[in-house]
Regions:
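Feature recognizes metal-dependent phosphohydrolase scaffolds
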Residues: 1-454
Length: 454
């Protein structure tokens, strides 16, 4: 149970490739030492009851956070921070459930404070709307957003000073420092993250297929949106390449240069920033979803890419931008789970786009109705395999169950693709031609045979 087991297998696998998504980048940022990324990762494991991933999988010590949370919220039921239900997984021990809720609340408040520090330091991120603690009237239990008052579902914040709401307490600073040391010092996490760097990037092109995780930021008219990074504008392919460079700088750059510091901050921006190609939504409404009932405030308006990608001409424009050629060329996407329960189709733009995020995570099974997709590519074309939820290996053995899958033919060609038609085939042909030229040069005497004298 947990991603560390999968990463152990991948680290020993001879050939694999990954296009980084927002969750990958969050973990990469945490491993690099970005404290907001660390807080987010810890928040997720407490939210879903997966603390074993950090403690057992990566040797990260959560005891200081647990001790602090128990003391700080001893009289607080932390009702808003209960475990998010996951199909097939339950924690029945009430003491464990209470401790997880306390830890969840404690790290969430720390996260909001840390975010404010970066937002203030980087006005170019334009994320002032994510600083909300100073808008709370703690005595009345309300918050004022855009001139309108909303009741808070919880207003018990013993670590927040209303006069200086974003200041970390001394205990919180100590917890942040200890978590930082644990993440940066985890040998196993370092090994796994380095493999993700070695075998991954923001996008890849293979056999006339363009693969990227989430989005290519677009304007309302379908043109590529220019994103300014440190005074220079980037769009399309150049944007993804710049972003990839910044992620590597954040992790690998030595010293404490301004370039390194900016890259570290930008890695967090990629997780939740409005112009991030790994996110591309107006906001990440974490605070609102926890503390406010008004569903309008929960909305995370998607960027134009998510609506315009259904148009074939938009997909063609993006494929042209990345230099993808071929009669059968496609964009292969993930990020947004395909809600098959609502009749959503993973094949879009007349077959030009395939969205293969069906929600492998159990937390999404109830939302999507399935347990993910696998896209298979072979000499005849594409087929999409839709998986049904898998309960457990033990149940599969006892009841003779297996992973149930449904196969859908996406694209079938009457003429089989030969090895020579693939990227690898073209590479082999180029090598063969080079060898032929070398042989010809030897035959006509341009290359002399050397005699070895001993």
């Amino acid at each position: 149970h947990g991603p560390h087991h999968i990463m152990d297998i991948l680290c020993n696998y001879h050939n694999w490739d990954i296009q980084w998504g927002n969750h990958d980048i969050l973990w990469m940022g945490a491993a690099a030492g970005n404290d907001i990324c660390i807080a987010n990762v810890v928040r997720f494991v407490t939210r879903f009851g997966n603390t074993g991933v950090l403690e057992d999988g990566y040797g990260i010590n959560l005891l200081p956070l647990a001790t602090f949370a128990m003391e700080t919220y001893a009289d607080d039921p932390c009702a808003l921070f209960g475990l998010r239900p996951v199909p097939g997984e339950t924690i029945s021990n009430p003491k464990t459930l209470r401790l997880l809720a306390q830890m969840h609340k404690a790290i969430s408040i720390i996260q909001f404070k840390l975010e404010a520090e970066t937002i203030s330091r980087r006005p170019e991120f334009e994320m002032d709307d994510r600083m909300l603690l100073h808008l709370i009237d703690f005595e009345r239990g309300i918050i004022t957003i855009n001139g309108k008052e909303y009741p808070m579902k919880d207003c018990n914040f013993p670590t927040i000073d209303p006069k200086d709401p974003y200041k970390l307490t001394d205990e919180e600073k100590e917890i942040v420092a200890k978590l930082h040391r644990s993440f940066v010092g985890s040998e196993k996490l370092r090994k796994h993250i380095k493999h993700i760097f070695r075998n991954g990037c923001m996008y890849t092109i293979t056999n006339s297929n363009l693969l990227f995780h989430a989005s290519i930021p677009l304007n309302a008219d379908g043109s590529l949106k220019e994103i300014e990074i440190r005074g220079k504008k980037y769009k399309g392919k150049a944007l993804l390449e710049k972003v990839g460079h910044l992620i590597r700088t954040a992790y690998f750059a030595e010293g404490d240069s301004e370039e390194k510091r900016f890259a570290m901050d930008y890695v967090w921006y990629l997780w939740c920033g409005k112009d991030s190609p790994a996110f591309d939504k107006a906001k990440m409404a974490t605070f609102e979803r926890y503390f406010l009932d008004d569903k309008e405030l929960h909305k995370e308006t998607k960027g134009h890419y998510y609506t315009l990608r259904d148009k074939e001409e938009v997909c063609d424009m993006i494929l042209d931008e990345f230099g993808v050629v071929g009669k059968h060329r496609h964009i292969i996407n993930g990020h947004v789970p395909v809600k098959t329960l609502k009749g959503e189709n993973p094949i879009k733009a007349n077959g030009k786009l395939m969205v293969i995020d069906g929600g492998f995570s159990k937390a999404y099974h109830l939302e999507t109705g399935i347990a993910g997709y696998t896209l298979e590519y072979h000499s005849r074309g594409f087929q999409l395999v839709q998986h049904e939820p898998f309960t457990s290996m033990q149940k599969a053995i006892e009841e003779g169950q297996d992973i149930k899958s449904t196969t859908q033919i996406v694209e079938l060609s009457s003429q089989r693709v030969m090895v020579k038609d693939t990227d690898k085939g073209r590479e082999l042909i180029a090598q063969i031609n080079d060898l032929k030229k070398l042989l010809e040069a030897y035959r006509i005497g341009l290359i002399k045979e050397r005699s070895n004298k001993y």
